[in-house]
């Protein structure tokens, strides 16, 4: 297994021994690696340092919409994205669940990042893009489309929308990634959405320290080791074995992010 999206620099992990100990527990569970996702420019810089210290870890470079009022140094993302363990830009996008930062600030941050990514791509710095979308599908997809960037280079992480919203993302041409929400009994629409995604455009993640999956929902913080439960849930929803689901998810992660996972024991 592989956790395509977590936040190992968050202070939640300090009482647990830090990122290395968290990754050790993931390895014991058959999770072969993870991507620690940036939320600010400084977080991206420190995430790069962390990833370069552990063969099981990669990182991204981007500004989260809920931190978009701190977007004054977007040009600095280029140097971070050029570092050897950076596999994507992001996470970036729109979040309409919270009132702050307001939508104008979020949009300015998103469009500023997309404009730079498009320009850097023409200069040879081409990486996929991790998208945060919360209650904003109808507003976000047109902005991504207007960027001119290839639709298949976007992944909508932590999908919590409806089947119709999943179809909109798929019609646009992007990928969809699922968290422990697919294990929640009170989220049947997310499970139905997960059944719709083609084999070649689905991924799994924890979004740790958030979204701990069943049967461990009361455990905080969430950890990359629990991505195995996301895999099991997706296998059940999609009518295949956990082994087949793990192989598919690992292959997709390697293909989308351009990485080779460590040759270590699998979860299933």
Question: Model segments located where?
Answer:
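Mid-domain alpha/beta scaffold segments of enzyme catalytic cores
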Residues: 1-268
């Amino acid at each position: 297994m592989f956790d395509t999206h977590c936040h190992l620099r968050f202070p939640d992990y300090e009482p647990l021994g830090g990122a290395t100990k968290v990754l050790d527990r993931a390895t014991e569970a058959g999770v072969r690696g993870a991507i620690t996702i940036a939320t600010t420019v400084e977080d991206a810089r420190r995430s790069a340092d962390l990833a370069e210290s552990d063969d099981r870890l990669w990182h991204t470079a981007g500004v989260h919409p809920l931190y978009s009022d701190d977007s004054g140094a977007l040009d600095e993302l280029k140097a971070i994205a050029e570092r050897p363990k950076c596999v994507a830009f992001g996470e970036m996008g729109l979040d309409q669940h919270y009132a702050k930062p307001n939508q104008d600030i979020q949009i300015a941050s998103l469009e500023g990042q997309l404009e730079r990514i498009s320009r850097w791509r023409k200069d040879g710095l081409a990486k996929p893009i991790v998208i945060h979308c919360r209650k904003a599908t109808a507003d976000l997809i047109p902005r991504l489309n207007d960027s001119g960037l290839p639709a298949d280079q976007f992944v909508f992480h932590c999908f919590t929308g409806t089947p119709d919203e999943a179809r909109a993302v798929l019609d646009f041409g992007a990928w969809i990634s699922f968290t422990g929400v697919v294990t929640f009994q009170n989220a049947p629409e997310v499970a139905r959405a997960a059944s719709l995604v083609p084999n070649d455009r689905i991924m799994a993640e924890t979004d740790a320290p958030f979204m701990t999956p069943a049967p461990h929902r009361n455990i905080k913080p969430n950890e990359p080791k629990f991505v195995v439960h996301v895999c099991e849930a997706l296998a059940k929803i999609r009518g295949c074995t956990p082994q087949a689901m793990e192989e598919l998810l690992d292959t997709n992660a390697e293909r989308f992010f351009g990485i080779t996972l460590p040759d270590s024991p699998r979860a299933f």
